[in-house]
Amino acid sequence: MDRIDALRAQLTTAADPARAPAMRAYMRGQFDFLGVAAPARRKAAGPWIQSQDAAGADGWLELANALWRQPEREFKYVSVDLQARHAAELPAAALPRLLVTAKSWWDTVDGLAAWVIGGLVRGRRELQTEMDTLAGDGGFWLRRVAILHQLYWKRETDAGRLFRYCSANAADPEFFIRKAIGWALREYAYTDAEAVRGFVASAALSPLSRREALKRIQ
């Protein structure tokens, strides 16, 4: 039994197939599920993820991509968790841009943005120029990644970059961009509420972005 088959056996045991239709419906019918709730998935996959610690960067990336190719969505969540565990150890060339654009939806994109790409860039600040490129990309999922990659950096956040990305994308009518702008600003407001208030007051944000940004500080 190879490693992916071993994980599949564990997830299948943890699955409640009766949950799968509702999980699929929540994702607008786009993806198949085994029916494993998030807590059960983490419990089932956690030991498997830990058992891959010795695989090294090449091994982790090979596994991450193999997981992404599995048809059920839960495997992509495990892929995100595996990469997030080792984000600080991955090489700069591992920036998982291709995974962002494969079977994209908010559930995988946000995990990649905040925990994988964010973790990778946090340890290798030279990669922020790549985020600058993504912030102006034609694909809105990649722009969402750029906006959200500093989501949990707190005082390490490059506020100038955050505000610049938000301004550059503020006029985009795409819901997932407007929501990302508000979310990123709201999270940074826990660190510097006055800076966020000042930016929101001067920027031409959509009502959705503005409302989300100020939700916790008004």
PLM-predicted stretches and their roles:
Residues 1-218:
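Alpha-helical scaffold domains
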